[in-house]
């Protein structure tokens, strides 16, 4: 089982995704670079957790859109 992400990571990721939806993809590496450019996060660990959570959110959105199109 995975670990639950802290609230500040989730809220920051959601704010970034809402403000810049076209900057993020399903690629963690690209999202990591985008988070580094868009947010002032001094910690590498926190930056990676935010990028990882954004990657999960983007994948969920795409899967949801695909399921809606198939239905």
Swiss-Prot record:
This protein's GO CC annotations: cytosol; ribonucleoprotein complex; ribosome
Chain's gene name: rps17e
Pfam families: Ribosomal_S17e
Keywords: Ribonucleoprotein, Ribosomal protein
Protein name (database record): Small ribosomal subunit protein eS17
Keyword field contains Mitochondrion: no
Similarity comment: family membership: Belongs to the eukaryotic ribosomal protein eS17 family.
A Gene Ontology BP annotation from the UniProt entry: translation
Domain of life: Archaea
The keyword ATP-binding belongs to this UniProt entry's keyword annotation: no
SUPFAM superfamilies per the UniProt record, alphabetical: Rps17e-like (SSF116820)
InterPro entries: Ribosomal_eS17 (IPR001210), Ribosomal_eS17_CS (IPR018273), Ribosomal_eS17_sf (IPR036401)
PANTHER family found in the cross-reference section: 40S RIBOSOMAL PROTEIN S17
GO molecular function, one term: structural constituent of ribosome
